[in-house]
């Protein structure tokens, strides 16, 4: 990854980038929302398209000279529609949060009632957290998971929908390891006359590969990020029925954004093109296979998993059985070369800054080439580190085993 000009002009920024590259190369990345994009995606994002302003949409811009970026955005839109079977796609959102905001602005008024998943049960900030714009602007009613099974309680969702008559029901999560029944959600939404939106940010790559039910046939609106399991650049996207296309486009521009980031949209187009290839299906299947194997291996090591396992790319470890908090576990694992994030678990007695769990995902390690045997080894390393966090000899052993794995699967060389 040559950066000869940058190294000469701004050695401080260059060094920070090199340090981050080394971190990614020498550590095992298990944060469920992160992934490693292809070099083609990075080339598109680092292209001259970063210079071009293009307010508006293809064929309807407020600036001249947009004929080439129009081609790029149209490619991204058409590939998104093809990949997910959608009638309309908007690829301009800068993030998943802004994609969600645009949907809310399209159909909601200040104070309207919305049903969304409790953040501590696996939801997302933009699904009604009181510290987020969503919880401030709208009256969010929370649904959650069953205290025994840790799976979405659809009877509870229905009861709350019937009681509160929401204008919108939101499905999707940032830390839910099980398959979501979109058909059931739509049935509930129809029963109370609500719109139905799905935030598939975490599972978009699995949906694209046919490994998770596609929400597009059921939802009025589907939002997603373009990174995570989709393995594209950091950004957002909205899919919707044609009847809402003009409203959604207007909500993004001029509603909440100005000029789109054309270099990022180019990278989105490349990633969506990659996801349309047959080998992406193999990749996504390997993500799920690795997650299931890692879950089994962790259970064999004596760990407790929220809901007992996983159907997708992520799993949650309940650390209470070994007497650790998520905050401590995250720090211990980081020191031996494994990157995770502390995460609340359902009915967590700890604060969000401490937590009783950690969230683990397999998208990034799968991109790197890790397979089932490596999942077994990762489980063993995690077990050694967390059960012997004060034993420097054991921690050194864990570091050596991490190094052996990362050296076996080089990244960006």
UniProtKB/Swiss-Prot annotation:
It is an enzyme of class 2 (transferase). Its main location: cytoplasm. It catalyses: (6R)-5,10-methylene-5,6,7,8-tetrahydrofolate + glycine + H2O = (6S)-5,6,7,8-tetrahydrofolate + L-serine. The modification N6-(pyridoxal phosphate)lysine is found at residue 228. Pathway: One-carbon metabolism; tetrahydrofolate interconversion; Amino-acid biosynthesis; glycine biosynthesis; glycine from L-serine: step 1/1. Coiled coil: none annotated. Homodimer. This is Serine hydroxymethyltransferase.
